[in-house]
Design a protein with these regions (language model features):
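Left-handed beta-helix
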Residues: 1-4, 199, 207-373
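Unchanged
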Residues: 1-255, 364-365
Length: 373
C-alpha cells in the first residue's frame, strides 16, 4: 500500500474509572480473546500497510507485553514492521507527550525517513473493521488535504466524548466541534481515523511545535477547517469506541449478538491477536451457560447468563453471573452472585459474595488472597 500507519495509544482516560488504573485503554480485553488495539492493527494488516508505529505512554506495560511479537498481525517482515514508540528524553526534548500532535512530533524522524506518500492515523481504542484502501481512494478522488473517517449517529447518542462534524453535500467538513456539551439530534461524529499526505503532515506538525500547540484535533483539524480541504469519509458498518466504562461494557455486550459475532469473526477479513495456548473451557456438572461468550482456559461450575468470561476464569459451585464481564484470570468463590458488573482481571472473589450494579455498571476490584492455609 502507499501508506504507513500510526496508532495513537498513549493517553490516560479517567472516564474508564478503575479499569484504566492497570493498563492503557488500547490494551483493554475485548470479546473474550482480543485487546482493543487488535482491531486497528488487523485493519492495518488487512489493508496491506506494512509499516506501523504504535505511540504509547500511559500505563503501557500491558500493551507493550501484548505487542512483544509483531508476527500475530503479519508485521514480522524485512521491509517495514511494527514499531513501538514511547516518549524519550533527548537533547531536544525533555517532556512526555503533551498531546496527540506532540506525540507525532516527537517521532517525526520516523515519518521523515519513510518514503510512502500517505499516512493513516488511527486511535487504538475503537472496535471496527475497515479497509483503509477505500479511505485512501476517497482521499485522492476528492483531492483532500485531510480525510476524516466519520459515522452517522442516531438521536440520543452521548456525543460528549466525540468530535461532531458538519459537512456540505460534497462531503467537505464545514465545522468541527470537539466533545460538545450540548445534546444533538442525529449527527455525524469523527471516528478518530485520518488520512493525510506524509509531507503535509510533517509540515503541519512542525508548525504546531513551533507555536507550542499539541493537539491534533484542536490545533490542526479545527484550526484549518476553512483553510484546508478536509473531507469526511462515512463508515456505515459497525464502529464503537471503548473510551468510557459504559461504552466498554456495551461494546463487549454487543458480541453476544450473533450477527455482530459473524461480522467480526466469520466474515473476511479476519481479526488477529496474540495467541495463548490454553485448553478449551471446561463445563463441570452443575454448569448452566446461556447466551454467553466463554474464552479458553475457563472452568465453570455455576450459572452464567448474558455474560462474557475472559481467559482463565474460575466460577465456583452455586454461583450466578448475569449481565456481567469477568476479565482474565478471576477466581470466583462458591455461592457468589454477580450482576451488571465488570470484574477486574486477576481478582479473587471470596465465597458468599454479592455484587450488583443497581444504578449503572459496577466495577469490582478485589485482590483477596486466593488460598488460605
Amino acid at each position: 500500500m502507499r501508506a504507513i500507519g500510526m496508532v495513537l495509544a498513549g493517553g490516560s482516560n479517567p472516564r474508564m474509572r478503575e479499569l484504566s488504573n492497570q493498563r492503557a485503554v488500547a490494551a483493554m480485553p475485548v470479546a473474550g480473546s482480543y485487546r482493543g488495539i487488535d482491531f486497528t492493527l488487523s485493519n492495518m494488516s488487512n489493508s496491506h500497510i506494512q509499516k506501523v508505529a504504535v505511540l504509547t505512554q500511559y500505563n503501557a506495560r500491558s500493551l507493550n507485553e501484548h505487542l512483544n511479537s509483531s508476527k500475530w498481525w503479519d508485521f514480522g517482515r524485512k521491509q517495514g514492521g511494527l514499531y513501538i514508540f514511547t516518549p524519550t528524553i533527548t537533547a531536544e526534548n525533555s517532556s512526555w507527550y503533551r498531546g496527540t500532535a506532540d506525540s507525532i512530533y516527537q517521532n517525526l524522524g520516523w515519518l521523515k525517513r519513510s518514503h510512502e506518500p500517505y499516512v493513516v492515523i488511527a486511535s487504538g481504542d475503537a472496535v471496527y473493521k475497515m479497509d483503509y484502501n477505500k479511505v485512501l481512494e476517497y482521499h485522492i478522488e476528492k483531492k483532500a488535504d485531510i480525510t476524516v473517517v466519520c459515522k452517522d449517529m442516531p438521536a440520543g447518542t452521548d456525543v460528549s466524548r466525540f468530535g461532531v462534524v458538519k459537512t456540505d453535500e460534497d462531503g467537505r467538513i464545514l465545522d468541527f466541534e470537539e466533545k460538545p456539551v450540548d445534546d444533538y439530534d442525529a449527527c455525524t461524529i469523527s471516528c478518530g481515523i485520518y488520512v493525510v499526505r506524509r509531507r503535509q503532515l510533517i509540515e503541519l506538525i512542525e508548525k504546531c511545535a513551533q507555536e507550542e500547540r499539541y493537539d491534533f484535533v484542536r490545533d490542526i483539524l479545527i484550526r484549518y477547517k476553512h483553510l484546508k480541504r478536509i473531507y469526511a469519509y462515512r463508515h456505515d458498518e459497525y464502529w464503537n469506541s471503548i473510551s468510557t466504562a459504559e461504552a466498554y461494557y456495551q461494546t463487549n455486550m454487543d458480541f453476544l449478538n450473533d450477527d455482530i459475532r459473524k461480522y467480526f469473526f466469520r466474515t473476511y477479513p479476519d481479526v488477529y491477536s496474540k495467541v495463548l495456548d490454553l485448553p478449551p473451557a471446561k463445563y463441570n456438572p452443575g454448569a448452566d451457560v446461556r447466551n454467553s461468550l466463554v474464552a479458553s482456559g475457563c472452568i465453570i461450575n455455576g450459572v452464567v447468563e448474558n455474560s462474557l468470561l475472559f481467559k482463565k476464569v474460575f466460577v465456583g459451585n452455586n454461583c450466578v453471573i448475569k449481565n456481567s464481564i469477568i476479565l482474565n484470570e478471576v477466581y470466583i468463590g462458591d455461592n457468589t452472585y454477580i450482576e451488571n458488573c465488570i470484574v477486574e482481571s486477576r481478582g479473587t472473589i471470596r465465597a458468599n459474595s454479592r455484587y450488583v450494579g443497581e444504578d449503572g455498571i459496577k466495577i469490582v476490584v478485589e485482590k483477596n488472597e486466593r488460598y488460605v492455609l
